[in-house]
């Protein structure tokens, strides 16, 4: 099952000896994905490649992971050093807060590093304090945030969008207002509130998919289904592909966060099982080609 070439467009590294990550360095806190004590330890590129050794992993893209908020570009600098030494990661998505008036300067700082591709500012708003990433709703509709997002747009960078499904209409507006920005939805819309929310999530995915500049990473399914099986995640995988199409969807691991719930092999083998009836070209798109296109790797 390891023959399919894989680009993993969503993984994380952290070095707790060298860098500061508040959510890890300052102790475990309530989160959308439960108790993460098991991963609250240094996770380096050697660890990631060891976890992935049974898969035909050819490239990977690193996503920001709650690095020191006083020095967001420090994460990109550190990761570029890792890439220069080890060959991974091939793409780097950093952090910026678009509400800050000097965000353009930060973007320029990120762009000094060859593997930098874009920004993720997680926009999840939830009434459950453990699940919320922002302290107010509809931030993307504020003039300050929009002005900052224009700085990303004019630099030709991509935007990784993490949110909850009930926010998708808000971000359909954003996608339509910035049609030249490649937006990449994270974690299949991050449905973490149980099966009763499936239908609302499904409809919202179709809503967001109306914007042709939005693609979807099918990942993070363990965060809302801690004891998942390939059959329990199948409806989410199939509905995501139905909404976005084979050409705008891609599989990803979310490792090591999803290591809380399964192995690297279990994730990729589940995706392979679910797509066993797909054509060679469709599988190539989902496992490899789309990630190469959207992240320019």
From Swiss-Prot:
Superkingdom field: Bacteria
InterPro entries named among the record's database cross-references: Amidohydro-rel (IPR006680), Metal_Hydrolase (IPR032466), Metallo-dep_Lactonases (IPR052350)
Keyword Zinc carried by entry: no
Family of this protein: Belongs to the metallo-dependent hydrolases superfamily.
Gene Ontology molecular-function annotations: hydrolase activity
This protein's record includes keyword DNA repair: no
The name this protein goes by in its record: Uncharacterized protein y4mH
One Pfam entry name: Amidohydro_2
Keywords assigned by UniProt, alphabetized: Plasmid
């Amino acid at each position: 099952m390891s023959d399919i070439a894989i680009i993993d467009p969503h993984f994380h590294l952290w070095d707790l000896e060298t860098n500061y990550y508040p959510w890890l360095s300052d102790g475990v806190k309530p989160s959308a994905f439960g108790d993460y004590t098991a991963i609250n330890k240094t996770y380096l590129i050697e660890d990631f490649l060891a976890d992935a050794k049974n898969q035909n992993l050819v490239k990977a893209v690193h996503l920001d992971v709650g690095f020191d908020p006083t020095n967001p570009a420090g994460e990109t600098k550190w990761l570029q050093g890792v890439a220069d030494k080890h060959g991974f990661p091939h793409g780097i998505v950093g952090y910026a807060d678009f509400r800050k008036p000097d965000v353009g300067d930060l973007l320029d700082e990120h762009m000094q590093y060859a593997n930098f591709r874009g920004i993720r500012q997680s926009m999840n708003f939830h009434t459950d304090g453990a699940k919320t990433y922002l302290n107010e709703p509809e931030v993307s509709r504020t003039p300050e945030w929009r002005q900052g997002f224009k700085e990303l747009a004019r630099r030709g960078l991509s935007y990784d969008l993490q949110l909850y499904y009930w926010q998708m209409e808000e971000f359909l507006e954003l996608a339509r207002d910035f049609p030249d920005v490649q937006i990449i939805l994270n974690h299949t819309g991050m449905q973490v509130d149980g099966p009763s929310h499936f239908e609302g999530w499904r409809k919202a995915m179709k809503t967001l998919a109306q914007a042709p500049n939005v693609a979807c990473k099918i990942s993070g399914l363990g965060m809302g289904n801690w004891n998942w099986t390939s059959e329990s995640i199948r409806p989410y995988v199939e509905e995501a592909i139905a909404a976005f199409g084979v050409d705008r969807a891609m599989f990803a691991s979310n490792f090591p966060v999803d290591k809380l719930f399964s192995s690297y092999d279990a994730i990729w083998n589940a995706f392979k099982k679910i797509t066993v009836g797909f054509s060679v070209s469709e599988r190539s798109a989902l496992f490899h080609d789309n990630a190469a296109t959207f992240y320019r790797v």
